[in-house]
Amino acid sequence: MNLDSTALAYQSGFGNEFSSEALPGALPVGQNSPQKAPYGLYAELLSGTAFTMARSEARRTWLYRITPSAKHPPFRRLERQIAGAELDAPTPNRLRWDPLALPEQPTDFLDGLLRMAANAPGDKPAGVSIYQYLANRSMERCFYDADGELLLVPQLGRLRLCTELGALQVEPLEIAVIPRGMKFRVELLDGEARGYIAENHGAPLRLPDLGPIGSNGLANPRDFLAPVARYEDSRQPLQLVQKYLGELWACELDHSPLDVVAWHGNNVPYKYDLRRFNTIGTVSFDHPDPSIFTVLTSPTSVHGLANIDFVIFPPRWMVAENTFRPPWFHRNLMNEFMGLIQGAYDAKAGGFVPGGASLHSCMSAHGPDAESCDKAIAADLRPHRIDQTMAFMFETSQVLRPSRAALETPALQNDYDACWASLVSTFNPQRR
């Protein structure tokens, strides 16, 4: 079966024990590793967590494939590595970037990666690395990331993610997550593509606890979609690239690694439409903490402290009375990397545009720019809708170090601090 078919089917749910077969009877019944698997397939286990994790935390999937993954020659380190591999010295300064320019030369997803910031080497079971991707051609090779799971946030152009477990098609305002070690290929459906990636080195992403919100709200499990089995039975030479401790290594295969005919388990790629997010907000006064906008979280061993939170700022009604409605001025223990998929962000009147990004590190003061602040103080507080917008945030408890490439790109705004420079004191001790 070829993965180029446009008709894609999905399975609904988050964290489910899924199962799928592209040929009838390809899944063994009642056991995982029979002496002879159906259709002459090989059984292979992909573990996303340690064997002895609590059952509620365990992630693993059984694959029934044409050729075992173990059949490959030695990997060799590629001469061309990911841009931004070298991190710069930590900086407390606030940083903001214009959209990165799309490539002029033929560039696939891998060649178009730029690491923007990171807070941990890949040999640590925690932390996050943040990238932007820029591409103008589909991959003719396959890739897997041994360093972490990948959260993809498209900003421009639709992608088809052809994975070992099947295909996902994602567009701007949708996201996709690829498990650590899952082989995949990125195909471009619109000629050019740009977007953001969080590489999660820590615990796998999961839905946040809802607490007093109750049993419904935010991102609902049924809106997450996993693929169905689709396989390639190809004997053409193909390059397989892996990312290992931050470096790219490759080997040449004599077959397609996307040859899984059937599978079952819960360590799966998935997609989610951000437009399905059930936004929670105040119906009385004050601006709630932005944690109410959390889509996915990777926890740490400290309860309530995230390795990374993925947070969105979607279209929503603003109805708070006697309230400064934009996100307030803030100094945060957490480190915030923001991007904009479409529209405008309500705390920035200008300078933060779709495809751009910003980084506010631990305790770096930030908040609405002067123009947004003045408008909010003088606003008529009638209910109004913030529409046609989608900003997001990768928030992590560990300090992010920008890469040298991110600091040297012409897209870096050297005048970012100026957006707060015209804030003036309005204090008057004689007038309350």
From Swiss-Prot:
Q: Which keywords annotate this record?
A: Dioxygenase, Iron, Metal-binding, Oxidoreductase, Phenylalanine catabolism, Tyrosine catabolism
Active site (catalytic residues): 287
Group of enzyme by EC: oxidoreductase
Keyword Metal-binding included in the entry's annotation: yes
Protein family according to the UniProt entry: Belongs to the homogentisate dioxygenase family.
Give the multimer and partner information: Hexamer; dimer of trimers.
Which protein are we looking at?
Answer: Homogentisate 1,2-dioxygenase
What gene name is listed for this protein? hmgA
